[in-house]
Swiss-Prot record:
It comes from Xenopus laevis (African clawed frog). The gene is srrt-a. Keywords: Cytoplasm, Nucleus, RNA-mediated gene silencing. This is Serrate RNA effector molecule homolog A. Acts as a mediator between the cap-binding complex (CBC) and the primary microRNAs (miRNAs) processing machinery during cell proliferation. Contributes to the stability and delivery of capped primary miRNA transcripts to the primary miRNA processing complex, thereby playing a role in RNA-mediated gene silencing (RNAi) by miRNAs. It is found in: Nucleus, Nucleoplasm; Cytoplasm. Its main location: nucleus.
C-alpha cells in the first residue's frame, strides 16, 4: 500500500532530523557553558554572580547527567529555567533557604548546611555535637544559652552622651558585678537539686561526703602501714626497670584495701610464677623450632636416592600399617585381661548368665574394671568397697575445698558510660546495676561544663562475671529517657610510665625529698589523718628523721685550704668535654628514702608525684591504684647546671596546685557578690507567709489558719513550722557555700568572636557578626535560626541605605563570602579572577560613616 502525501511530506521534513538534533544538542551544551561564565556580559554576570555557586554547580552536573530531550515532533526547545533559580534583583539571596532560616517558609531542599563559611569551623567549640555541626539542629538539645557580657564599647552605646569617662567606668564595673551575681543566682537555681551540686555545697551532704572520704583515707593508710611493716617497700625502687615489682606492690595495696588477707596476697606470687613460665615457654619455642630445622637439613643429604624412592612408594601404605599396629596392641592388652577374668566368668555362668564363648570387645572393656574391685574381697561384700572409696574421695575433696584459695581481689571488670546527664543520681545507677551478679561499686566523674555538665560513669563488677553479657543487657535499658550507651572498659595496659631520667641526679633527688615531705605534711594536715585523742598532731612515722637527708654536706674547710694554696679541689677538676656539664650522679640511699615517701603519696593520698597530679575518687574506680609514674633510665649524655635548675623550677611550679588550699572569697567580696544573711532571709520567709485578708484577718498559707494580727502569724510560724525555718537557714548556708568558693562551677564565659580581617585590610564588621549571627550553639533551642553563611550563601545583614551596588557588591564580590578571600578547592566555581574597573581614589562605603 502506497504512502499518503502527508506521510511523504513528513519524511522529507525529517530527512536531516538526526543531524539537526545533534547540532542542537551540541549548541545547547556550548551555550550552557558560555552562560556559566559570568564575565561574558557585565549586566548578566553581575546578576548571576549573586547566586550561590553551589547551586550552579549542582544544577549543571544534574543537567549534564541526564539524557537530552527528544526533538522528534517539535522544534528545539529553549532551556527551561527553574523557578527557584530566579531571584530577581535581590543581590543577597543565598543558594538555599536554610531549614532554620527565619525567611524560609518551610524546610529547605538543599543538603545540610554547615554553621557558616567553611573556614568558620575553626572558630567553633569542640563541645558542639556532630549533629549540630552537620546542620541537624532538630536532633540536638543545646540547652539554655549562656548570656554574653557586654564589652565596654557596647556598654557605652547604652549610656547617655552626658556621662563622662570616670562615671562610665564606674557604671561598667557595677554592671559586671550585677551580671556575675545574676549568673551565679541562675546557676544555683538550675543545679541546686542535682546530686553532684548538693554533695559539694549542701551542709548535710557535705558532712556525709567528708565522713566517707575520711573512712577511705583511713583504709588506704592501714593498707600502706601493713605493706611497710611486712617489708614490701624495702627492695623496690621507683625505676622503670622494676615495673613488675612496682605493679606487685600496688596490687598488694589494692588487695588489702578490698579486705584481703595474707593468703590472698599469695596470688601475686602465683601470677609472677605463671608469667615466668610463659616467658620461658616463649623463649624455648623458637629454639626448638630452629633445632628441628637444623636436624632436618642434616638428615636430608645423608639419605640415598634409593631410600627416597622407597619412601615415596611406602607413603600411601602408612595409614593401613598404623591401623594394623593398633589392632595388634589391643589384642596383646586383651590377652592378660582374659586370663585374670577366667574365675569371674565361670561364676557368672553358674549364676545363669549368658554362656556365649565369644564376648565382644566392648563387653571386655566395660567389664574389666569391675573384677579389680571385687577380687580382693572374698566374703561376698564386693559392692561395699567402691562406696568406701567414693566416701574417702569426697572427704579429700572437702578438705581441699576447706583450704582457702587466694582470691584475685585486685582484678575487676567494669563498664564505662560516657554521657550521664547531671540529673541522674549515683543511687539510680547503683539500683540499676545491682541486679546483676558480681556488682561492686559505681564511680561518677565531675560534671564537665564544656559538655553540658555531662558525667562519666564506671560500674565495677567482680572478675568472675561475663562482663559482655551484662554490658549487652544494660545497653537496652533507658534511664529517665536517656540511653546509657555502655561499653566494656579495658584493663590498664601501661600502669607504670617513666619520665626523664634526670630525676636520678642527686641534687634533684634531695629537692624531691624536701617537696614530697612538705606535700605529705600538707595533705595529712588537711585530712586530719594523724590527730590523736588529745587533739595533738602526732608525727607521721614516715617523716621521722627526714631532716637528716635534707641537709647537704660540703667540704668547705678543705676547699678553703686548697684555694688558699692556689690549688683547685680534685672533685671540681673539669673532666673531658664541656666544663659546664656534669654527669648524672646517683645516690641509692637518698633514692630509697624518696621512694618510700612517693609510695605513701600514691597509696594513701592518690597523688602521682612525678605526674604532678591527684587521681580523684580513686576508691570508687575499677582499679583503686592504677597508674604510677617513675624515673626513667639514666640519660646517655651529660647534663648542664642550667638544665638541672630549669627542671627543678618547672617541677615546683607544676606541683604548686597540690599545695594550694581551697580558696574562698573574702567577706567584703562575698557581700559584694550577694552573700545572704540567714536572719534577713528568715524575716523575708515570715513576711512572705503572712497574708492580710482584711481588717484584723491574717492568714498563714503554710497551715491555712487565720489570725487577728501579723504578730500571731509570726509566732505560729516559729512554733509550728520550725522545720521550715531550718530549711530556709540551710538554703542560705547552701548558697553561701557555693558563693564563697573561688573555683565554683559555672557556665563557660563566652566571648564574642572577633571578625577576621580580609586580604584588603577590610574587617568583616561590614556584615558578618550582627547580633543575630552569634555562634549557633549560643542561640536558644527551638527558635527560628537566621540564615547563616553556607556554600555560596550571602551574608545576612540589613540593606545598606547608601545603597547602590558598588560598595556592597565589590566588598563581597556578590557571592556571599569573605572579602578578598582567596578561592580554594572547597569553594566550587570559576577559578579565574573577575576583570572589572574600579576607581581606586573613590572611598569605600564603609568610610561614609
Amino acid at each position: 500500500m502506497a504512502d499518503s502525501d502527508d506521510e511523504y511530506d513528513r519524511r522529507r521534513r525529517d530527512k536531516f532530523r538526526r543531524e539537526r538534533s545533534d547540532y542542537d544538542r551540541s549548541r545547547e551544551r556550548e551555550e550552557r557553558r558560555r552562560d556559566d561564565w559570568s564575565d561574558r556580559e557585565w549586566d548578566r554576570g553581575r546578576e548571576r554572580r549573586s547566586r550561590g555557586e553551589y547551586r550552579d554547580y549542582e544544577s549543571r552536573s544534574r543537567r549534564e547527567r541526564f539524557s537530552p530531550q527528544r526533538h522528534d515532533l517539535s522544534p528545539p526547545q529553549k532551556r527551561m529555567r527553574r523557578d527557584w533559580d530566579d531571584h530577581g534583583s535581590d543581590p543577597y539571596h543565598s543558594g538555599y533557604d536554610l531549614p532554620y532560616s527565619s525567611s524560609a517558609g518551610g524546610p529547605g531542599y538543599g543538603p545540610p548546611q554547615p554553621w557558616g563559611h567553611p573556614e568558620m569551623h575553626v572558630l567553633q567549640h569542640h563541645g558542639i555535637p556532630i549533629q549540630a555541626r552537620l546542620g541537624n539542629l532538630h536532633q540536638v538539645d543545646l540547652g539554655t544559652p549562656a548570656p554574653i557580657m557586654k564589652t565596654f564599647k557596647e556598654f557605652l552605646l547604652s549610656l547617655e552622651d552626658t556621662v563622662d569617662e570616670t562615671e562610665a567606668v564606674k557604671r561598667y564595673n557595677d554592671y559586671k558585678i550585677d551580671f556575675r551575681r545574676q549568673q551565679m543566682q541562675e546557676f544555683f537555681l538550675a543545679h541546686k537539686d542535682e546530686e553532684w551540686f548538693r554533695s559539694k555545697y549542701h551542709p548535710d551532704e557535705v558532712g556525709k561526703h567528708k565522713q566517707e572520704s575520711q573512712a577511705s583515707l583511713r583504709n588506704r593508710l592501714s593498707a600502706f602501714m601493713f605493706l611497710m611493716e611486712k617489708s614490701w617497700l624495702n627492695e623496690v625502687q621507683l625505676d622503670i626497670a622494676q615495673s613488675p615489682a612496682i605493679i606487685k606492690v600496688l596490687d598488694a595495696a589494692v588487695i588489702k584495701m578490698e579486705g584481703g588477707t595474707e593468703i590472698d596476697l599469695k596470688i601475686l606470687d602465683e601470677e609472677e610464677e605463671e608469667a615466668k613460665r610463659e616467658a620461658a615457654k616463649k623463649e624455648e619455642a623458637p629454639v626448638t623450632e630452629t633445632e628441628k630445622v637444623v636436624t632436618e637439613e642434616k638428615e636430608a643429604p645423608a639419605k640415598p636416592e634409593n631410600d627416597k624412592e622407597d619412601e615415596s612408594e611406602e607413603k600411601p601404605v602408612k595409614p593401613q600399617e598404623e591401623e594394623e599396629k593398633k589392632v595388634e596392641k589391643k589384642v596383646e592388652k586383651e590377652e592378660p585381661e582374659r586370663e585374670t577374668r577366667k574365675p569371674g566368668t565361670r561364676k557368672r555362668k553358674r549364676s545363669g548368665e549368658s554362656d556365649d564363648g565369644s564376648d565382644s570387645e566392648s563387653d571386655t572393656e566395660t567389664a574389666s574394671p569391675k573384677p579389680k574391685a571385687e577380687t580382693p574381697n572374698q566374703n561376698g561384700r564386693a559392692e561395699e568397697t567402691p562406696k568406701k572409696e567414693e566416701d574417702t574421695e569426697k572427704q579429700k575433696e572437702k578438705q581441699k575445698e576447706d583450704t582457702v584459695k587466694p582470691r584475685p581481689l585486685h582484678k575487676t571488670c567494669s563498664i564505662f558510660m560516657r554521657n550521664i546527664p547531671p540529673n541522674i543520681s549515683k543511687a539510680e545507677i547503683t539500683a540499676l546495676c545491682k541486679r546483676y551478679p558480681g556488682f561492686m561499686r559505681v564511680a561518677l566523674s565531675e560534671p564537665q561544663p564544656e559538655r553540658r555538665f555531662l558525667r562519666k560513669a564506671y560500674v565495677t563488677f567482680d572478675r568472675s562475671v561475663n562482663i559482655k553479657e551484662i554490658c549487652w543487657s544494660v545497653q537496652n535499658i533507658r534511664l529517665r529517657e536517656c540511653e546509657l550507651s555502655p561499653g566494656v572498659n579495658r584493663d590498664l595496659t601501661y600502669r607504670v610510665r617513666n619520665i626523664n631520667g634526670i630525676t636520678l641526679h642527686r641534687p634533684i633527688v634531695r629537692n624531691d625529698i624536701k617537696l614530697a615531705a612538705r606535700l605529705i605534711h600538707a595533705l595529712d594536715e588537711r585530712a586530719v589523718l594523724w590527730e590523736g585523742e588529745q587533739m595533738v598532731l602526732a608525727q607521721n612515722p614516715i617523716l621521722k628523721n627526714i631532716t637528716d637527708y635534707l641537709i647537704d654536706e660540703v667540704n668547705a674547710e678543705e676547699e678553703e685550704l686548697l684555694f688558699s694554696a692556689g690549688r683547685t679541689p680534685e672533685t671540681e677538676l673539669p673532666k673531658d668535654g664541656n666544663p659546664t656539664e656534669i654527669s648524672v650522679e646517683r645516690d641509692d640511699k637518698l633514692i630509697k628514702v624518696l621512694d618510700k615517701l612517693l609510695f605513701y603519696l600514691r597509696i594513701v593520698h592518690s597523688v602521682d608525684y612525678y605526674n604532678t597530679c591527684e587521681y580523684p575518687n580513686e576508691d570508687e574506680m575499677p582499679t583503686r591504684c592504677g597508674m604510677m609514674h617513675v624515673r626513667g633510665p639514666l640519660p646517655p649524655n651529660r647534663v648542664s647546671h642550667g638544665e638541672v635548675a630549669e627542671w627543678q623550677k618547672t617541677f615546683e611550679e607544676k606541683l604548686a596546685p597540690l599545695f594550694a588550699v581551697r580558696e574562698t572569697l573574702s567577706e567584703e567580696e562575698s557581700i559584694k557578690m550577694g552573700k545572704k544573711d540567714p536572719e534577713q532571709e528568715v524575716e523575708k520567709f515570715v513576711a512572705a507567709n503572712t497574708q492580710e485578708l482584711g481588717k484584723e484577718k491574717w492568714l498563714c498559707p503554710l497551715s491555712g489558719k487565720k489570725f487577728k494580727g501579723p504578730e500571731f502569724v509570726r509566732k505560729h510560724i516559729f512554733n509550728k513550722h520550725a522545720e521550715k525555718i531550718e530549711e530556709v537557714k540551710k538554703e542560705v548556708v547552701f548558697f553561701n557555700n557555693y558563693l564563697i568558693d573561688s573555683k565554683r562551677p559555672a557556665l563557660l564565659e563566652v566571648k564574642p568572636l572577633q571578625p577576621p580581617v580580609g586580604a584588603a585590610g577590610q574587617a568583616l564588621a561590614a556584615g558578618l557578626l550582627y547580633p543575630h549571627q552569634g555562634p549557633p550553639a549560643l542561640l536558644p533551642y527551638a527558635q527560628p535560626r537566621p540564615p547563616v553563611l553556607g556554600y555560596g550563601g550571602a551574608p545576612q545583614f540589613p540593606p545598606n541605605p547608601y545603597g547602590a551596588g558598588r560598595g556592597n557588591y565589590d566588598a563581597f564580590r556578590g557571592q556571599g563570602m569573605y572579602p578578598g578571600k582567596p578561592r580554594n578547592r572547597m569553594m566550587r566555581g570559576d577559578p579565574r579572577s573577575i576583570i572589572e574597573y574600579r576607581d581606586l581614589d573613590a572611598p569605600d562605603d564603609v568610610d561614609f560613616f
